Amino acid sequence: MDLRILVILVYLLFTLAFGIGFRKRAKESKVEFFLAGRNLTKLLLFFTMAATNFSAFTIFGFSGAGYRIGYSFYPVMGFGTGFMALSFHIIGGKILKLSRDRDYITPSDFIFDRYQSLFLKKLFSLVMIVFTLPYISIQAIASGKSLESLIGLPYLGGALLITGFVVTYVALGGLRSIVWTDFMQGLMMVLFTLCAFLIIASRSGGFAATHQGVFNAHPDLLSRPGMGGAMPYGVWFGYLFLWFFADPMFPQLFQRFMVAKDEETLNTTIVFYPIITSFLFFLTVSIGVMGRGAFPDLSREATDTIFPMLLGQYTSVFLGTVLITGSIAALMSTMDSQLLTLTSMITSDFFTIRRNEVLKEKITIIVLGTLGFLIAIRPPQTILEFISATTFNGLAVLAPAVIGGLYWKSANRYGAVTSILVGESMVIAYYLQLIHTKGILPIVPIIAATTAAFVLVSLFTKSDKENRHIVFSIHRRALLWIPVFTVLFVLGNDFWNWGRRPLLLGGLPLWVWYYFGLGILLSLAFKLFLQRKHV
């Protein structure tokens, strides 16, 4: 057997062992199968939140964007996703408390509890399911491309292999098997990506020298707004805006809010999130930038395979295969959570399953995995464009109904339904290119219209059926922190530094170093904010 295939199979069998190990425990109850008993500790929650969110997009999409756009893509991801962790407190902390008190299992359980509308609950779940399916296919697409590029496995064979193993261990072990594989895969993703980064930097001629060469040939890759002006102000701001509203609406992340042992456990994840995003996202974007030196003329479609191409160029067959398992870990750790969460929503929100009847749940996991694979048969041109046009915008539309439901007593079912219908109609219109907004991402007008519809319809309609007893008030001390986080957000949009020829320090533009520091500052701000909250 080819040594490269053997390495991949050993890794996959190792992940399968977790499913087998937790098989008996997963049969105890739905809470155990879907939520791991609601008692995840700090370390496990941090790794499962990070690994679940950092998908194939993080490895292949970011490196591809680094190749095409340059370092201009790094801050909108590193700082933008780190700043997004504030929503883990705004939304996640409240969902954690309510889920324990009121026995939520799926994201739409909160929607039904708050708005007392079965139609709205099903609509909310349907939107999550429809817009997450393409994201599942992204993991299959990336696995097929990476295995094809590195070890020559046919694209569909690689996609089917990874999808099949993920479906198997999820069906066997439930969330507890996922959490422990997330811990292992999260470590692999970070350590192996770091090793790949160091090897590529060293063998391409040295980090600083390689960047100087890239800067001489393509200065826009180290400048803003990036290669070909890809990241103008409106797009830059739009991405930061998008992550804040879209990421907490990922059903697999939303459900993770319910599994923390306590609020302090969730707070630990919030504090360290900007650190891990600033570090890991830099590595993957930087690998793409350095790839310009080794492969200067890739087609747009081929840019998403720059990571395995560089491993093939600069490492041995065995080492390259070992390191690529880190990227496979990234996509598996997202796919497994998506499959389990969507299964919980389909079986709980649309069908009634008798106690301890797990067969339908496992069949649902298999069906979802199959659908994701079928979408991957005809992959889109680039990972970034595909999910930006579908998943992120479609899920972000749900945020006003959730945030308004948590904090605004006047919010009602009519406003929530209208906001979702208006928002998704705009998502479809943008996707079909019936609407165009030059120089700004669609998410900005979409969220503006969605929020306006939610507020106006709630104000001008009456409904006495809502459960307003679970609405939270905003503490005065929390309001004092609004200016602090506003300033940090403005600092993350440092447009006053744009358009200048960058000064390089250690091969990197000074503004990239600025964002390293800003990520650390954001983490410290989260720490102080969450500490003072408990005083």
Question: Model segments located where?
Answer:
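Membrane-embedded helix-loop-helix hairpins and adjacent transmembrane boundary segments
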Residues: M1-P509, G519, L528-R532
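Hydrophobic alpha-helical transmembrane segments
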Residues: W511-W513
